[in-house]
Amino acid sequence: MVTEWKNFFKGCCMQLLNVGFGNTVMVGRVVAVVNTGSSPARKIREIAKKNGKLIDVTEGRRTRSMLVMDSNHVVLSSVQSDTISQRLQAMRIDLQLGECREQGKKVYNENE
């Protein structure tokens, strides 16, 4: 079973984003970070709840942001949407730098 997971993630950079209280989501699967104050956000929340795709990680606190995932799941978080956006941006920059480093290693190894 472990080998299957290793093969599944082989070549894939799995970065996790903290969405509060020790809960994480995969960075590559986040489609949107939505502020909960708008009417469309409430509609998204209702639809996700109706379809059984709503994940609440607020632990009873006020919902401050919603993460829409590529699987149509909606994650409710008590962390501000601006904070989550900043964390996402920082992680994506790190990922791009890592890819540049990997490409540099490949070029360096080919020249040897």
UniProtKB/Swiss-Prot annotation:
Top-rank taxon: Bacteria
InterPro entries linked to this entry: RemA-like
Any matching Pfam family: RemA-like
PANTHER family xrefs: REGULATORY PROTEIN SSL2874-RELATED (PTHR38449:SF1), REGULATORY PROTEIN TM_1690-RELATED (PTHR38449)
Family per record: Belongs to the RemA family.
Protein's name in the database: Putative regulatory protein DP2861
Species per Swiss-Prot/TrEMBL record: Desulfotalea psychrophila (strain LSv54 / DSM 12343)
